[in-house]
Amino acid sequence: MTNGQSPAGLRGEHMRDRVITRKEEALYLAATTREPLASVAVVLADTGMRPEESFRLRWESITWVNGRYGVLFVTRGKTAAARRPIPMTSRVRAVLESRWHAASKPAEGWVWPAPTRSGHIEPSSIRKQHEAALAATPVTPFVTYSFRRTFLTRLAESGADPWTLARVAGHSSTAVSSRYVHPSDDALQNAIERLGGHKIGHSEDEQEEAARQLLLTE
């Protein structure tokens, strides 16, 4: 036991915090050929939604006309910030539109209906498919929540400001969002290089020009 947590609990927490590389994501998605995980995984990877938020997604909460590829709305949450619009990427639209057409274009209802008490998929609905996808690839195991942390980390690395990050994540404050960001080594290196590109201080040419101007004024 460590700080009141079992080793298994700590391992689960570590997997939850893990940021998935783009190569790992590609391998995993290629291995997820069965529904509902095939479409759920894409939505999680490209929206940063909490898994339970995606499970509760309804057709009436999706619009195909707003934004570049459409927008989906999270209509339930513990806070007002959790209820938010999320722009769709092209591949999110592709998988959701495919399901919509396959379901005869319903105006309402669960996107992923299931024979559960809630009427929609639950963690148990995709657990075996998730485990099978991991087993079929060399990817280090992770939990589906890792997609959220990965999405938010990538969004931060792309230059999104803290307020945008919090809004997309559904966080009530930027302080909460900061806990989800784990810059990669490459991102840190790129940030330092960008900083160097701003030429903080003065280059030798700039210093020589300044000295020349000073002599002219004397």
Language model regions located:
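Conserved tyrosine-mediated DNA breakage-rejoining catalytic core shared by Y-recombinases
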Residues: 2-9, 18, 22-27, 47, ...
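C-terminal secondary-structure termini that scaffold catalytic or DNA-interacting sites
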Residues: 4-7, 16-19, 114-118, 193-218
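Short, leucine-enriched amphipathic alpha-helices that occur as contiguous helical runs
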Residues: 25, 36-38, 123, 127, ...
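Active-site/catalytic core of tyrosine-dependent DNA strand-transfer enzymes
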Residues: 22-23, 89-140
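Catalytic-site neighborhood detector that most strongly recognizes the C-terminal catalytic loop/helix
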Residues: 19, 76-81, 162, 169-194
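Phosphate-coordinating loops and pocket residues in cytosolic domains that bind phosphorylated ligands
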Residues: 30, 56, 64, 182, ...
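C-terminal catalytic core of tyrosine-transesterase DNA break-rejoin enzymes
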Residues: 39-42, 46-53, 146-172, 179
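Residue-level marker of regulatory loop/turn positions in helix-turn-helix DNA-binding domains and
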Residues: 17-21, 32-33, 43, 122, ...
